[in-house]
Amino acid sequence: MRSHVWAHGCDHAYLAEPGPGSVPPPPVEADAPAWASAQRAVHAGTQIVEVTLHGTGTGSVVLEDLEVRVAARRTPPAWNVYQMSQGCGGALTPAAFTVNLDAPRPVLRPVAGNDSGGETGRVIPAPAFPMRVSAAEPVVLRVEAATTGCDCDWSLDLRWTAPSGTGTLRIDDNGRPLRTSAATGRPAYGFATEQGRWAR
């Protein structure tokens, strides 16, 4: 499970308490978990989670449904926003499930993606349950969560069926809830490479 996925591999924001003079330069995406942990930072506004699922035996597993569980909603902390990019884009927008964490009963909504890298854009079909996976045919689930009103603790519950029985897989941050916080109105900083510092 990857919980620090950036849009287009370069666009993301974190909310952190330290002032800009105490925060190191932005990392590359692969180093984001360690960077965020060192700053005690949380995802600002949005969080993208990717989970790779596959079977373990000779048979296939049917993924039946995926549900969002919001465990807590708090007032967003009055911290600073640190932008990991000064603007970037990409030709590929993956298909995903999106969810509004502010909704009273958050529901995942499938959204189609697109690949505009060629002469003609190609639509990537929206994901849909049920899905069948096996050891040889994995599936990557992408969830894009957003909030404008809370400091949210949340997780995902995946229901599955296999020849051996049924079950529910909890998807979280190594036993802890995932955490995404609204950042509306907070001071936002981008990294000024020429000056080697964060600036508004």
Q: Where would I find each of the regions flagged by the language model?
A:
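Low-complexity, intrinsically disordered segments enriched in Ser/Thr together with acidic residues
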Residues: 117-151
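Short, hydrophobic/aromatic beta-strand segments
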Residues: 59-67, 77-80, 109-112, 155
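Long, charge-dense
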Residues: 72-115
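Extracytosolic low-complexity repeat regions of secreted or lipid-anchored proteins
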Residues: 48-55, 64-73, 155, 159-160
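Acidic, serine/threonine- and proline-rich intrinsically disordered appendage/tail regions
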Residues: 97-121, 126, 153-157, 161-200
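Extracytoplasmic low-complexity, Pro/Thr/Ser/Ala/Gly-rich segments
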Residues: 1-43
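Short, solvent-exposed beta-strand/turn "edge" segments of beta-rich domains on protein surfaces
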Residues: 34-44, 52-61, 76, 132
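Extracytoplasmic
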Residues: 46-48, 94
